[in-house]
Structures are given as structure tokens and as C-alpha cells.
Regions:
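N-terminal pre-domain/capping segments
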Residues: 1-93, 158, 251, 255-258
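Active-site beta-loop-alpha junctions enriched in small/polar residues
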Residues: 6-10, 32-34, 66-69, 105-107, ...
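Residues at the N-termini of beta-strands
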Residues: 28, 99, 190, 231-232
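Acidic/histidine-rich catalytic cores of soluble enzymes
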Residues: 3, 28-29, 61-64, 121-214, ...
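H/E-rich (His + Asp/Glu) clusters that bind or coordinate divalent metals
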Residues: 219-220, 225, 232-233
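Charged helix-capping and loop-helix junction motifs
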Residues: 42-49, 78-86, 112-123, 175-180, ...
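Active-site acidic/histidine proton-transfer and metal-coordination neighborhood
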Residues: 13-19, 53-56, 60, 70-163, ...
Length: 258
């Protein structure tokens, strides 16, 4: 397994972020395709410069994130969101990552859920775009069980869909992050290393520094390895007052385990 970090966890602009990732001794970085890195703003010259900056820092792009204000299950103004994701997928292929991460919306087991046809058709179209271009759209885990997500994938005739497995998201939504790995073993193309504490009577579930939450990382990483996952394990820290220090501590923590 290869270790990386999300640029957004560092709270730094792109160039300074690359230098910090190199200082931390990590091999990869995930970046959101927003601002100057947005597909509609990144020129061919910009793409060449981005690839050069990555190479000069000895880094690989692990994936592009594609933040959406609304999921792909929301019918209002849906087509522009589909087009946006499609553009980011194509950009991810051009930049060598080939993986785009998206929070698509909740996958419901209810046959009469009115949002599901929109989600299904959107993801089928995007997955088939991935089939044609060699890119993969990775759905972020957390809102449904691994078995529910697998069952949903099995209804779609495309190999262009995968999973970004985020154990903390699952834990905070009441799912066991280890038990839910196996159903998705053939779909996991990218993973986040993020920790969390379970909800208690006196508090809500919350993110925690890596190694400071309720996830059994030795068991989790051991299970990932047993399932023959050899891809990226990318540290993500979304809260905290000193996230760079938390990331550095997380790097040291993971290196003791992988």
C-alpha cells in the first residue's frame, strides 16, 4: 500500500502543499478539481506545468476530488452536475490518476425511492464514460452498507464505477468499517485514512486524529491487505486546529502499521 494525503487536509495552496507532502515523505496527493485546477480553467499549458510540479516533487496524483453542492440523486439542475463530473473524470485520466472521487448521494434499498432513478441513470452514464476513457468514478462510502453498495453496483452494466473506501465515514454512520470491506473488495480503487469516534449517549459521532478514534487500524489495514488491496491509503483530516501536525502524526502512526 502507498501512502498519500489530501491537499485540503493541509490547508495550503497547491505549490506549498506539494512541498509539504514531500517534506512529510509521502508518495501521493489527492486534490480537488476546483479553482485553478478546475477542468474549465486548466489549460494544456497548465496541465503540463501541473505534471511537471508533481514529478519535480517526486509525487503521484492519487485521485481528483469532485465536490458537488448537491448529489446525483437530486433532479434539479442535474445535467450540469453530470457534465461537471464527466469533465473531471477526463481530466483525471489526462493527469495520470484515472480516479475521480465523488459523494453521489444516498443509495436507498427502497424500490419506490423517487431519487433512485436519477442516481442510477447518472451513475450509469458516468460509468460508461469511464469505460470509454479509461477513468474510474469512485463513490465515497459512508451513507450505506458495503452490501447495499455492492448490490447497487451489480445492477449497473459498467466497469467504470468503483469505491473510495472511507472507514471514518462508515463508523460515524453506524457501520463497522472492517466488516464492510469484504463486499466491496472488487470495487475499492482508493482509500482514505481518516479516524472517528462513535456516537455516545452524551455526544455525537465525530472525526478524530488518526489513531485517536475508535477504528482498529491494525485489523482494518490487515483486512485490506488480505483482500489484496495494493492501492493508495490517503490521509484525510477535515477538522482540528493544527491539521498539518495531525497529518504528520498520522503519517508516523501509519508507518508503524504498513
Amino acid at each position: 500500500m502507498k501512502l498519500g494525503v489530501t491537499l485540503e487536509s493541509l490547508g495550503l495552496p497547491f505549490r506549498r502543499g506539494l512541498a509539504e507532502v514531500r517534506r512529510l515523505g509521502l508518495a501521493g496527493i489527492q486534490v480537488d478539481a476546483v479553482g485553478e485546477l478546475s477542468p474549465d480553467r486548466l489549460t494544456d499549458t497548465g496541465k503540463r506545468e501541473l505534471r511537471h510540479l508533481l514529478r519535480s516533487n517526486g509525487l503521484e496524483l492519487t485521485a481528483l476530488g469532485c465536490p458537488l453542492r448537491h448529489g446525483l440523486d437530486e433532479p434539479e439542475n442535474l445535467q450540469p452536475r453530470i457534465d461537471r463530473v464527466r469533465q473531471v473524470m477526463s481530466l483525471s485520466f489526462e493527469l495520470g490518476a484515472r480516479i475521480t472521487i465523488v459523494q453521489a448521494g444516498r443509495i436507498s434499498d427502497a424500490a419506490d425511492d423517487p431519487r433512485m432513478p436519477f442516481l442510477r441513470e447518472s451513475l450509469l452514464a458516468l460509468g460508461q464514460h469511464g469505460d470509454r476513457t479509461g477513468a474510474t468514478l469512485a463513490l465515497e462510502t459512508g451513507l450505506e452498507s458495503g452490501e447495499s453498495l455492492k448490490t447497487f453496483f451489480d445492477t449497473l452494466d459498467t466497469g467504470g464505477l468503483g469505491v473510495n473506501y472511507d472507514p471514518a465515514n462508515l463508523l460515524m454512520n453506524g457501520f463497522d468499517p472492517v466488516e464492510n470491506l469484504a463486499p466491496l473488495k472488487d470495487r475499492i480503487v482508493h482509500t482514505h485514512a481518516k479516524d472517528a469516534r462513535r456516537a455516545r449517549v452524551s455526544r455525537a459521532a465525530m472525526e478524530a486524529p488518526l489513531g485517536g478514534g475508535d477504528i482498529d487500524w491494525m485489523q482494518y489495514l490487515g483486512t485490506l491487505g488480505a483482500l489484496e488491496y495494493r492501492g493508495w491509503v490517503v490521509i484525510e483530516r477535515e477538522t482540528g486546529t493544527d491539521r498539518i501536525a495531525d497529518v504528520a502524526a498520522g503519517v508516523a502512526f501509519l508507518r508503524r502499521l504498513v
